[in-house]
């Protein structure tokens, strides 16, 4: 599909994922809301249509280029805490909140947007050490042990390998967890 059709599909998805019933519960359960993945050549407007779609739907948008992150900034930093199991005390490792998840909460407080899109750009260019974290993120909507807030949709974008030498092909496990939208270059839709 072209970028204009992709934008319309994104808007439909945002409306479907943010719709609630009379009890203020999501019409589509959060566990069934698959992240959107826009895959297409660089420069065709994938990021721009995310901005346009979020504005059209009145939801927030927080964008991250994942290649700028390390495993620690995505998952959080380890810290030692004391826990008692049975009658014995242990020192165990837990993780601080991810910089990315923390930014969503800060954005919500700053803007008042309780619903939004967490947009991860260049998702298929992550380092090898971050790839398992991205798989967990796509499946469970978590970075480390912290979850993306309810009401927030996950969307991502990437480029096919012929456009970027650092692309890591997404495996079937990752592709099975997303709603893939192939976006083709179509100059005519910009005229």
Can you annotate each of these PLM segments?
Residues 1-191:
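AAA+ P-loop NTPase catalytic core and its hallmark functional loops
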